[in-house]
Design a protein with these regions (language model features):
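N-terminal single-pass transmembrane signal-anchor helix
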Residues: 1-38
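Aromatic side chains
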Residues: 12, 35-38, 61-62, 68, ...
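Membrane-proximal N-terminal amphipathic helix
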Residues: 40-67
């Protein structure tokens, strides 16, 4: 008696499916960290751009008033509120979607008339608390032109 012939069936074998899953897992293992790194760098650049914009505003204020102006997120005075204390876009929820909280104060051991220090702190409670920049930490910009950061990375400002 002859055995019936096996029919050709369409589909994937278990081995083929597992091989495809391994390839997808490898691609994700490489792509996700690179994507996260890109997001951190993009938000860092946004914070730097905001610091530069605010320093330009400070210089304009200095040329009119012969002093710089200290401000923070909790500034009550009208003059302090003219400066944007968050990085990113203006608008109703701009601060909540921002990565950095920005403040201005006198440079250490100097009067506010002589030097202003802008600080951009990542992931505070007033902005996106989930954002952290382990490489650069807090970004700083002085009216003397000095740029800095609190993190271990040497090249935070390019």
């Amino acid at each position: 008696m002859a055995s019936p012939a096996l029919k050709n069936t369409a589909g994937f074998s278990l081995i083929e499916l597992l091989a495809a899953l391994v390839i997808v897992a490898l691609l994700l293992a490489l792509a996700v960290p690179a994507y996260r790194g890109h997001i951190v760098r993009a938000k860092r650049v946004q914070g730097q751009a905001t610091l530069l914009k605010l320093m330009q505003q400070q210089e304009r204020y200095y040329s009119q008033n012969n002093t710089y102006l200290a401000f923070s997120a909790g500034s009550d005075d009208a003059q302090g509120q003219q400066f944007q204390w968050w990085s990113g876009e203006e608008g109703e929820d701009g601060a909540a979607r921002s990565a950095y909280e920005i403040d201005a104060s006198a440079c250490p051991e100097m009067a506010i008339k002589q030097c202003v220090l802008l600080r951009a702190r990542p992931g505070t409670t007033r902005v996106d608390a989930q954002f952290q920049d382990a490489d650069c930490g807090t970004l700083t910009l002085r009216s003397t032109g000095e740029r800095g950061s609190s993190g271990p990375a040497a090249r935070c400002w390019l």
